[in-house]
């Protein structure tokens, strides 16, 4: 219902129904972006069926982000929506929503499913909230700090100003950004070193 309401802004108004069957071997509620994939597929179908709007990867990403994060209030960022909409491997500059696509051959990945229920949304909300709180506190104390500029990092000094419970979240935010920059550097090379990428993925996880 939310998707249909949002799509009215794009002059997409369904006037008849369809019987749709969706099947997949991707486990749900496992942090594999299955909800984003479904929303993007749904938006793509509706736009192509009930509107004359030109459908692009950028448009699908923007609308799905609006639905999932702004309208529904989920705590994720933009990476799921943009990666699924564009396909393959991308680097997303979240400040400008600029996408850099890559066409490297990646190795196969093995996904282990524990079948244990988990609160993915609750976990994301906790991580995001505490990371933003810690970053904001450091910025207030050290105005020159810029998380997008590693040269401004004085980690030990920053950590000393935070409560112990917030330190892991700030350390993770800093560490994850460095990992992202290192991964971008590797993907910008003509030859992709799978071992280095695998190591960075493990560090990030």
Regions found by a protein language model. Give the residues of each.
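Gly/Ser-rich oxyanion-binding loop with an adjacent helix/lid
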Residues: 1-104
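C-terminal nucleotide
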Residues: 83, 88-205
């Amino acid at each position: 219902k939310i998707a249909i309401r949002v799509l009215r802004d794009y002059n997409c108004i369904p006037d008849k129904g369809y019987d749709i069957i969706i099947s997949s071997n991707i486990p749900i509620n496992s942090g594999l972006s299955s909800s984003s994939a479904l929303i993007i597929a749904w938006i793509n179908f509706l736009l192509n069926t009930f509107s004359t709007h030109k459908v692009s990867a950028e448009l699908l990403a923007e609308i799905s982000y609006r639905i999932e994060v702004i309208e529904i209030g989920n705590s994720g960022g933009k990476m799921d929506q943009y990666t699924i909409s564009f396909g393959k491997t991308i680097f997303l500059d979240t400040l400008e929503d600029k996408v850099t696509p890559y066409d490297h051959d990646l190795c196969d990945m093995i996904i282990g499913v524990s079948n244990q229920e988990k609160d993915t949304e609750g976990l994301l909300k906790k991580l995001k909230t505490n990371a933003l709180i810690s970053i904001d506190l450091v910025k207030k104390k050290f105005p020159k700090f810029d998380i997008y500029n590693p040269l401004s990092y004085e980690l030990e000094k920053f950590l000393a100003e935070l409560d112990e419970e917030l330190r892991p979240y700030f350390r993770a935010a800093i560490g994850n950004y460095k990992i992202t920059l290192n991964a971008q550097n590797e993907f910008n090379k003509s030859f992709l070193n799978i071992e280095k990428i695998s190591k960075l993925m493990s560090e990030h996880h």
